[in-house]
Amino acid sequence: IESGLLKDDLGLVYEIGTLSKILAPALRIGYMIGPGGPLLDAVVQKTSDAGFSAPLINQEIASYLLDHHASEQIARVNAGYRQKAKSVRHWIDSQLGDHLVECRGGSAGFYFYLTLDGIATHENSAFFRFLARTTGRPEIDGHPPDKHPRVVYLPGEFCVHPQGDLVTIGQNQFRLSYGFEELPRIEQAIDWMRQAISYAHTSGG
């Protein structure tokens, strides 16, 4: 998408972003680009007052990377996320497809939004408890302190207005992130989701 700054004849556009997703997450550097004036001055002052700026060495590293390697790095990052999205969508379709009502996402950002067919996903559901390893069954949860690996997702109930029209369907939805974890672990997590669906069917919850 072309930046609005390129056609901002009135000086009204400010672009805000982060370098964490395209350069290196550990840098923890955000940026704001726009016309000089009271707003930009206030943001700079507030950042300085709060002491929230990244260390100067990190800023210098980021500046160098932007000047010398940004285009190539952005292309690599975009290609990497594109491949991750394709792989994750393939596993979702192959492992969970028979139980899916809808799957959205994967074209921008780092999330897929899934709607399951008759499977509750809220915090008290069998699906959630299986993946959180809180079923109370050692063969599923593991034995403390060696609990089996867990899968963390955002239940759909937290993505809809509590008094809105989507409350009911939100009980069968969840958001799955693919931005951070490596692909082999994501594939394994989706297989555990398949197992969680089977558990939910047999446990009635």
Per-region residue spans from a language model:
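PLP-dependent class I/II
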Residues: 1-205
